[in-house]
Design a protein with these regions (language model features):
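Extended substrate-binding grooves/exosites of carbohydrate-active enzymes
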Residues: 1-218
Length: 218
């Protein structure tokens, strides 16, 4: 829960180790205090350490959504899987902090629908900073099944119990790097509005040509 002094020294030491390891990497833009650990004095101490040692970077922590008394922990409003209308409500309240989805669009199975509702928020609100898809790649291991086929195996495929079965299969690419159908949607909505418009026009022209070809065939 991040409360009390029992683990404060340990969590600040973890923050220090991460900062010293990664501080010279140009790709590091934001320090994170952790994931799904509520909020309290211990986590606040991590933020204070980051701000003191590296004021050039922001600090992120989602857990304050469960304990607003420690809102100072994070430099941005962060949520997991917030609904588009919830985000809009926040952004329309003239907030002091930008909004970011630290997890969204959980891509398990044939999913990832509705991305449009999130991406279009960026066209309206400068404070909407987008989100991080959960996640990029399935966690799976290639093995030979009972029929002798080489397949990607998940929980339960290795005589392991208990298991979450295919819950680890939530990426936009398979474990071997092959793209899932959802990648088409990601590629489209992550393009610029101008590129999306050009793609729509090209698709409309192709559909019209197909209709003419079909009519001529009849």
């Amino acid at each position: 829960r991040g409360l009390g002094d029992v683990y404060k020294r340990q969590v600040v030491d973890r923050a220090r180790s991460m900062l010293e390891r990664d501080k010279n990497h140009a790709a590091v833009l934001i320090w994170s205090c952790g994931n799904e650990s509520y909020a309290g004095e211990d986590i606040l101490a991590m933020t204070q350490f980051f701000h003191a040692k590296d004021p050039s970077r922001l600090v992120h922590y989602e857990g304050v959504v469960h304990n607003r008394a420690f809102a100072a922990i994070t430099d941005m409003e962060s949520r997991m899987y917030a609904k588009p209308w919830e985000i809009r409500e926040y952004l329309e309240s003239h907030p002091k902090k930008p909004f970011i989805l630290c997890e969204y669009m959980h891509d398990m199975g044939n999913s990832l629908g509705g991305m449009e509702s999130y991406v279009k928020l960026a066209d309206e609100f400068d404070q909407y900073q987008g989100g991080f898809i959960w996640d990029y790649m399935d966690q799976a291991l290639r093995h030979t099944d009972a029929l002798g086929r080489s397949v990607l195996g998940y929980g339960g495929d290795f005589a392991d119990r208990n298991t979450d079965y295919n819950f680890s299969g939530n990426g936009i690419v398979y474990a071997d790097g092959a793209e899932k159908p959802a990648m088409q949607d990601v590629r489209y909505w992550y393009a610029s509005p101008a590129d999306r418009a050009a793609q729509d026009a090209a698709n409309a022209a192709a559909a019209a040509q197909a209709d003419r070809t079909l009519a001529e065939a009849w």
